[in-house]
Amino acid sequence: MTLEERNQQVRAFFNGKIDTYDNVHSEYMKTKVLLAESLDKYAKKILDLGGGTGLELIHLFELFPQAQVTVIDITENMLEKLKTRDFAGRVTTICGDFFEVPFGKDFDAVITTSAFHHFKKDEKIRLLKKILGCLKDGGQFINCDLIALTAEEEAAQLVDLENNIGYSKHVDIPLTIENEIDALEKAGFKQITSGNGGKENYGLFIARKNISHIS
Ligand SMILES: C[S@@+](CC[C@H](N)C(=O)[O-])C[C@H]1O[C@@H](n2cnc3c(N)ncnc32)[C@H](O)[C@@H]1O
């Protein structure tokens, strides 16, 4: 299955989950809140990749009421739900695939949560390079995502992916912390840190484009 086909499978999956998504993900609020809490204080122009129904933006707009947020997401039903939130007027939504849609430029920060564990490492490096290109110098990339706890788990999920052809449900293929960091380094990010992402199997990764601003 190609990356494009897998991304369409992800889209079909989330389009079908819209009635239950927010309830299921209320358990994951800590993983979402960490994004806003990790942002530089001056952050204003923010790109949220895979923002879905906007759960991470609830806390973000409390902390950053002046933020201008762009959300790119492939799943139209998720974005329709986001558009019903009271902060929707402060969000620009773009419905499309990360690998195809132009990101724009000069963002203070790019954030993402629970959205990048659908990509193989080489695909992720490609995406990270695209993110680097849309950040201001010193800008932040913050990713809170599912991780593989061991190299064996990472490898096993890749095997599941290869065996998944023809099935309707997408397969999660999270990387280990070490591979997440290596992907960020290979893409050209600096000042990379990692920590717990609010659940045992979630990692929080923060990295910068070049030099850091005073936050
Ligand atoms: C688990 S949801 C997370 C939504 C939100 N960030 C949250 O934490 O509640 C993953 C989101 O990533 C989006 N997504 C996954 N792969 C994508 C891709 N290739 N391009 C654009 N959006 C994608 C999905 O459509 C979905 O809305």
Predicted regions and their residues:
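Conserved alpha-helix/loop element of class I SAM-dependent methyltransferases that forms part
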Residues: 26-42
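C-terminal alpha-helical "lid/dimerization" subdomain adjacent to the S-adenosyl-L-methionine
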Residues: 144-187, 192-196
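A short glycine-rich, Lys/Arg-flanked "PGG" loop and its adjoining helix->strand segment in the class I
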Residues: 125-137
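Short catalytic micro-motifs in class I SAM-dependent methyltransferases
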Residues: 114-115
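A conserved beta-strand element that flanks and buttresses the S-adenosyl-L-methionine
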Residues: 111
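Class I SAM-dependent methyltransferase SAM/SAH-binding core
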Residues: 47-49, 53-100
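Class I SAM-dependent methyltransferase Rossmann-like catalytic core
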Residues: 2-29
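Core SAM-dependent methyltransferase catalytic element
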Residues: 187-190, 196-215
